[in-house]
């Protein structure tokens, strides 16, 4: 079994989740931060459950100049502004937390 030692080898894919009351501007707010930081959206899924938005994004930070910690802070601030919770984590952490 090969162990991945560097961030470059592990990849720069992240999972972003957005949960909260649906309103105008949520997707624009999240994707605006990603675009401004050269973070590419690889996949996106959203649904409205009654009045609540549930959105999951898979994104690639390979070309971004900011680190994941800074991105988390930026997204969290935007979430507070929009009245939703926005979380971001490395793909490996997400897989570990949601394994069966």
Language-model segments: residues:
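A conserved regulatory-domain signal marking ACT and ACT-like small-molecule sensing domains
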Residues: 1-100
């Amino acid at each position: 079994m090969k162990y991945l030692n560097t961030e470059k080898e592990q990849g720069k894919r992240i999972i972003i989740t957005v949960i909260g009351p649906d309103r105008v501007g949520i997707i624009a707010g999240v994707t605006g931060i990603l675009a401004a930081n050269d973070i590419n959206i690889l996949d996106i899924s959203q649904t409205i459950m009654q009045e609540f938005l549930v959105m999951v994004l898979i994104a690639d930070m390979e070309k971004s100049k900011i680190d994941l910690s800074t991105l988390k802070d930026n997204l969290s601030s935007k979430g507070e502004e929009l009245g939703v919770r926005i979380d971001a984590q490395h793909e490996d952490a997400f897989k570990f937390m949601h394994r069966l």
